[in-house]
Amino acid sequence: MNANDATLTGLATAHTGSTAGHPAPNAPAASSFDLILQAAAGSALGNSGTPYTLTISAIDLTCVTQGWPTLTLHQSFDAASGWKPSGTGQGYQCTQTFPVPVPGGGPGGPLAGHTLQCVASLISRGAWIVSIIHTNPFVLV
């Protein structure tokens, strides 16, 4: 990876507290699930403090509508935002877990049986760095 670049490398839905992706993240009867985001940054960027905006949204593919309100986070390439040196020493990595409440409070809610997909984007000021990623489609119960 270029020393001055960053990319979103993974986005998955999982049961709360799990690190393994799951196509029905609130099954069999949970009121929330986790969205796990992974990213990588080059050696010059990863601890530079450069600001960026991380936006996460959900799309209800069944009804072709917004699944729930968009999450917009103003973060920086620094330890406070979760960036740390990668195991290989060639750059930085970041893994963030976002708890997602199931709309309607849990199983049987208004999106039960719907297929959804989450999309995340990382955009630096001036759009020098832009990365977009999406989850596999998933179903809420």
Located regions from the model:
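Contiguous beta-strand segments within globular domains
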Residues: H15-T53
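Extended, solvent-exposed segments with strong compositional bias
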Residues: T65-G105
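Short beta-strand elements
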Residues: M1-T13, H74-A80, L116-C118, L122-V141
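Amphipathic alpha-helical interaction modules
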Residues: A29-S31, N47-S81
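Intrinsically disordered, low-complexity segments enriched in small/polar residues
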Residues: L8, H15, T19, A30, ...
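Internal, hydrophobic beta-strand segments that form the core of beta-sheet-rich folds
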Residues: F33-Q38, P51-D60, Y92-V139
